[in-house]
């Protein structure tokens, strides 16, 4: 139980575009510039995951929230964004995600709460399959924002119940469900009803297990170089000072 509580899957960086200063989570982002956001995100992902030539990853970084998620918070569970122009989508909201997938090999992508063109992002085949996997070549893990699958039937009303939501999320490409409701617990029922095949479910389980193998969770800790870093180094004063100094130097006036 102690080991299970120490997750090596970190849900950062937030590469959403900060367009409205009233958005209360804007401080998590890298601003309103898609190029700057892309470059900062690439550096963060590479630093968190470690060198690609290593057998094991330090952590699994996560590009979030995919996509077109920039507040406000109060309407994120019900919003339907159906007026996003193709130019805004491809030149403003998607470049950072594409960069993290293709230039940083980010291991996780988190789908957002709201709907985009009538489909919830975590059940949006165009976003998760056609763009993310088919066009960009992403082959790793998609995780839902916490409670996003439950939103399918509680607030978006795009699903009739938890069983339908579980099938919709899985078939669209969301591998792991976070949060409350846990619709994916209904997948065995969905399989028994013939709504989804066990082979389809296995495909998503395999992606999850591949991530855990990449972290070395299935091997002896002595084989994983990152386990040799002492806790005295983690969050130490030298690293805090470096982070503070970097933050001071990177402030940008647009």
Describe every region a protein language model picked out.
Residues 1-254:
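Glycoside hydrolase catalytic-domain context in secreted enzymes
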